[in-house]
Amino acid sequence: MEAKGKNVAGRKLFLYATAFFSGMSVMAIELGASRLLAPYFSSSQIVWTVIIGTIMIAMAIGNVWGGRAADKDPDPVRLYRRLLLTAVWTAAIPFAGRYVIAGVSGLLALFVKHNFLVWASLGSCFALFVFPLMLLGTVTPSLMKYATESLDDNGRTVGELEALGTIGSIIGTFLPTFVTIPAVGTARTFLIFAAILAVISLGFFVTRKKWVARSAVIAVVITALMFAPFNYSFAFWEDGLTVEDESIYNYLQVRETDESVILSTNVAFGVQSVMMKGGGLTGMYYDYALAAPLMAENCEDVLILGLGTGTFASQCLKYFPGCEVTGVEIDEKIVALSREYFGLPEEVEAVVGDGRAYLTESGMYDVIMVDAYQDITIPFQMSSTEFFTEVREHLNPGGVMVVNMSMRSEAEGSMNEYLKDTIASVFPYCATAKVSGGSNLELFATTDEEGFARLDSRIAALASDDPLTGIMPRVQSALEPVEGGGHILTDDKAPVELLGMRVLDEIISTELESLRGQIRENGIMSLLG
């Protein structure tokens, strides 16, 4: 009788452990999904919505399936077979996932005309994650069936199972974000949690003396893959990348050409920073932004919110000697890359942290540049009237704010229109300059009525051999005053992800229509030639 009691207690303890590690794996896979998709589709709130919605659908289906399966057959063997299958599928994601994403995106590109990123991320998420999360969704209802011995204590048992699953989910939320992804990357994070599921299954099958060899082989192979020296590349079609890495916040890619060093945080679109190896101007928006120090009454203190790799900071030191530059960058790995590959001068004070939080505690500046981006959009908290009011309050008399807007669109109610109207509601004197040959728009704002006249006079006074002579007249001729309007962003209401996605959708739709036209004329094989 005593032995039987110990056996029941041991069995129940193992079921509780299953609830804990399964809950942990659910959240780890969800966070891994966001990191797997982010380099291709961004990590915006829209993509997160797709991921969470897909996973909730899968879990709901799994809950129904698991409950019915447990009622039909109360033997836990089927549950642990499902967990073993989940382990195999999860372990395959790092190797097959990028090709599935490319395949789904390529297929949808042939006929999806609008909201391509939404549909492509949704299709990829369904293809990769519905099945394993549906299997994990069967765990809780199955365990409730197996662990409940009588109606007298079923409430307590269910509560304990739910609590352990939730505690596991909490750990599975923090562990990938702060430990495994920064330490070993997304690919090995999937393998770590696949190995956990495989070991749990193996433990069960050892006690039952069933499926021992198969589960042992699977557990050993997955564990071996964790330590195997394989090279995982999100941009698998790219050769010769200088750096491909991940941080808590970003996918990071550094590549070099004969003339420049380039940082990207997305494999599909956008370049975050460019450094010209020969020094000098880049021909990009950083050059246009140099009009801000010329416009300011003084240029002694410069603050950059969104330092990136420090191209603008380096240019400020080069073309405006004597100024002190502070840059705030939330991603410490980008700061490290800026020192190692982009030649960020030691004179630049690089602060790791959130731009708005730093601004609140900082002093006064002559120039403040706002160039903070989360993938394709400005973070909502750095696009509102409250934020720009705070910037204004940290500018010295005669100071200038310059904002880089990376998505140019002429459509009514576009992202840039919202930003222009919002800034114009805070600063009385604003103007924009379109960057030639790119999609960027630079906005200059000041409370000094003499600011733009000062810029004109200083451009006229530039020496003929001054490097800025080649770019500043171009900026001057491109300046257009901002009148302002009723599209205002606030801390409470700032739909920047939707606005940014709308502009990106316009760009992608144009590119895809060109692609479809090529296929109609020359056939699909023309893309491979």
Regions found by a protein language model. Give the residues of each.
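Alpha-helical transmembrane segments of multi-pass membrane proteins
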Residues: M1-E244, E256-D258, V267-V271, L294-L303, ...
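Alpha-helix N-cap and loop-to-helix initiation/capping positions
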Residues: G280, M382-S383
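Surface-exposed interaction patches
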Residues: Q315-C316
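Short beta-strand "acidic-cap" motif of Rossmann-like dinucleotide-binding folds
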Residues: G327
